[in-house]
Amino acid sequence: PDRERPELCSAAIDRVRREWARALKREPRRRGVAQARAVLGLATPFSESALESAVRWLVLVLGLPVPRVQYPIDTSEGRWWVDMCWPGKRIALEADGRKKYQRAEDLWKEKRRQDGIESQGWTVLRVSYGDMMRPDRLGAKILTRFPPGEVAHLQRRQELEWAGMRLEAGLREASLLGQRLPRGSAGFVP
């Protein structure tokens, strides 16, 4: 999908959602259908990496409002897109894989980008694959960016969690994404 013109693919996205909803309706008692419906209702085709999807899953499990994804922020350095954010709070989350920083100038460009975004009054939190290995700790870190009064009233979306799994157990046990990791892995390398 085109993040600059998301309306161009909205009909296709709606069609796919309806197809999946019909498929789930045919199997109402099958294990995992309720969770699949919850995921389908919150899914987006605009996440650009597995890490972005995993972080988005975590913020949704925590009960935070649905973040905007691939959101443009205009700065004196130009227009930059953040992976996900809450515009009303001016909080942005960036999911960073190692491939993003192959050359020294990549790191410098990213620093200028973040400086520009922060100069517009935004708080930027960077998340790596290693952070997602302990979603409980990462979740606590993310929540510190939000007003404590709001955090106190969040309702966890338990329907997005795998039955019997806990965030405290780490990504391997907390989500289906983690189930695909090789045993003993310290993290992903995108």
Predicted regions and their residues:
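Metal-dependent nuclease catalytic cores that hydrolyze phosphodiester bonds in DNA/RNA
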Residues: P1
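Surface segments flanking catalytic/ligand-binding clefts of nucleic-acid enzymes
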Residues: E4, L8-P190
